[in-house]
Amino acid sequence: MSYADSSRNAVLTNGGRTLRAECRNADGNWVTSELDLDTCIGNPNGFLGWGMQNFSHSSEDIKLEEGGRKLTCRPKTVDGGFRERQGIDLNRIQNVNGRLVFQ
């Protein structure tokens, strides 16, 4: 299940690099969890992609939108400019018993 369906109070920390949310665990309790998005999202020439790394090193104005379901930013291109705002659906981030996990 997408983390957004079983979590609350999602925010970005560390300059947009870290997703933090309160996630419901199997016992029904709310547990604070964090996921370093630089371990699973990259920026290949101005577009965000899964299964890559370090998007935050080459992006600016990183935000959560749509109630935490989407991450947007202005990624840098190989020529050094910044592309218009790009987004990636965070549906690959799951809440696994109170932990944010990339799947």
Curated annotation (Swiss-Prot):
Recorded family membership: Belongs to the cyanovirin-N family.
Record's keyword annotation contains Secreted: no
SUPFAM superfamilies the record matches: Cyanovirin-N
Functional description taken from the UniProt entry: Mannose-binding lectin.
UniProt keyword annotation of Nuclease present: no
Protein name as annotated: Cyanovirin-N homolog
Keyword vocabulary terms for this entry: Lectin
Originating species: Tuber borchii
Source taxon at top rank: Eukaryota
